[in-house]
């Protein structure tokens, strides 16, 4: 790959000297989509991602406009060729279908993570370590000033809040991003035996999760009493 296996092209990351963009927002001829959060989504001529990510992206963006846009689903740990490149996806542990990408060319491997979570999750595939020579990592909270409590502590606090609210005879309300965080909370509570109701926007995402094997059978839609 030479000295710089990755480059900026029109403000987007691209594998040097190729058409393969990484989580591009602007339309590209070919792009890898690590996951379906809005800050990574774009409409491209060809999109490489896991089947779950492609389904979530279609749910969020709608069908391709004017018939443009080819979805190229790829399975984890299954190398495939793209021109002179060999690509392989690995779970990223961020949300359902999230993936890291390993790009090999001329014996040199580039690793690109997108958002990455190495802690155990309730509703996403567990992250794996991929071997590479050059690693490009998204680090939203990479600065040392960001210090969060351990995840088990946070989950215990959520459960304590829910129990306290129910003991007081009131309905506990939890807020979370509609894709990812909401399903983590709902799956955690459902597995603990709580019956939950989800906002219709969250419920629509839940259906995609369920279609890809994440059991959310105790999660019911909440009928809105007013427009949202």
Task: Report the location of each language-model feature.
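Single conserved hydrophobic/aromatic residue that forms the stacking wall/gate
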Residues: 219-228
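Divalent-metal (often Zn2+) His-rich catalytic cores of metallo-beta-lactamase-fold enzymes
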Residues: 173-192, 201
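The feature marks the mature, well-folded catalytic cores of soluble enzymes
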Residues: 156, 166, 195, 213-219
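Short, charged/polar "capping" segments at the starts of alpha-helices
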Residues: 54-58, 184, 203-208
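Short, solvent-exposed amphipathic alpha-helical segments in soluble enzyme
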Residues: 37, 127-129, 188-193, 213-214
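His/Asp/Glu-rich metal-coordinating catalytic cores
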Residues: 2-26, 30, 36-175, 180
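Long, charge-dense
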Residues: 197-214
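Short hydrophobic/aromatic-enriched beta-strand-loop microsegments
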Residues: 67-74, 193-201
């Amino acid at each position: 790959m030479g000295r710089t296996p990755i480059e900026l092209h029109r403000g987007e990351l691209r594998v040097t000297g190729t058409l393969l963009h990484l989580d591009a927002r602007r339309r590209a001829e070919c792009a890898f989509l690590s996951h379906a959060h809005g800050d990574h989504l774009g409409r491209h001529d060809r999109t490489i991602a896991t089947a779950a990510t492609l389904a979530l992206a279609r749910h969020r963006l709608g069908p391709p406009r004017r018939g443009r846009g080819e979805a190229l689903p790829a399975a984890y740990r299954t190398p495939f060729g793209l021109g002179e490149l060999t690509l392989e996806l690995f779970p990223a542990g961020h949300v359902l279908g999230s993936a890291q990408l390993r790009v090999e060319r001329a014996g040199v491997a580039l690793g690109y993570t997108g958002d990455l979570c190495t802690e155990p999750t309730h509703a996403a595939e567990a992250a794996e370590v991929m071997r590479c020579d050059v690693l490009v990592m998204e680090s939203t909270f990479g600065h040392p000033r960001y210090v969060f409590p351990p995840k088990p502590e946070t989950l215990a606090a959520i459960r304590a809040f829910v129990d306290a609210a129910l003991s007081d005879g009131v309905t506990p309300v939890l807020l979370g991003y509609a894709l990812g965080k909401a399903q983590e909370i709902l799956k955690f509570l459902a597995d603990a035996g709580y019956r939950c109701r989800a906002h219709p926007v969250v419920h629509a995402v839940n259906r995609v999760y369920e279609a890809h094997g994440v059991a959310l059978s105790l999660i019911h839609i909440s009928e809105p009493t007013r427009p949202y």
